[in-house]
Amino acid sequence: MSSIEKRVKEIVAEQLGVDEAQVTNDASFMDDLGADSLDTVELVMALEEEFDIEISDEDAEKIQNVQDAIDYITEHT
């Protein structure tokens, strides 16, 4: 597991209040991890802060699961 993948999973678990074991690469933030739209906004903000990147609203809408977040951050850091 890459350091980006590990950190993304830690942030997702922390932001959504779920156990890290539930945070699999294909876990959907809303469907599998119980996030609502506010949770996803806060999650994107936490990822931006952690990785010092800016995620546009358009791109944020495309980040639906853990792997999407990992891929986006890997491409933009």
From Swiss-Prot:
Database matches in Pfam families: PP-binding
Can you list the GO cellular component terms from the UniProt entry?
A: cytosol; membrane
PANTHER family xref list: ACYL CARRIER PROTEIN, CARRIER DOMAIN-CONTAINING PROTEIN
User: Under what name is this protein listed?
Assistant: Acyl carrier protein
Q: In which pathway does it act?
A: Lipid metabolism; fatty acid biosynthesis
- What subcellular compartments does it reside in? Cytoplasm
Enumerate the InterPro entries for this protein.
ACP, ACP-like_sf, PP-bd_ACP, Ppantetheine_attach_site
The protein's organism comes out as Geobacter sulfurreducens (strain ATCC 51573 / DSM 12127 / PCA)
Return the SUPFAM superfamilies for the record: ACP-like (SSF47336)
Q: Which NCBIfam families match?
A: acyl_carrier (TIGR00517), PRK00982.1-2 (NF002148), PRK00982.1-3 (NF002149), PRK00982.1-4 (NF002150), PRK00982.1-5 (NF002151)
Q: What does this protein do?
A: Carrier of the growing fatty acid chain in fatty acid biosynthesis.
- The Carrier domain covers which part of the protein? 2-77
Question: Superkingdom of the source?
Answer: Bacteria
Single biological process term from Gene Ontology = lipid A biosynthetic process
Known Gene3D superfamilies for this protein?
ACP-like (1.10.1200.10)
Modified how: 4'-phosphopantetheine is transferred from CoA to a specific serine of apo-ACP by AcpS. This modification is essential for activity because fatty acids are bound in thioester linkage to the sulfhydryl of the prosthetic group.
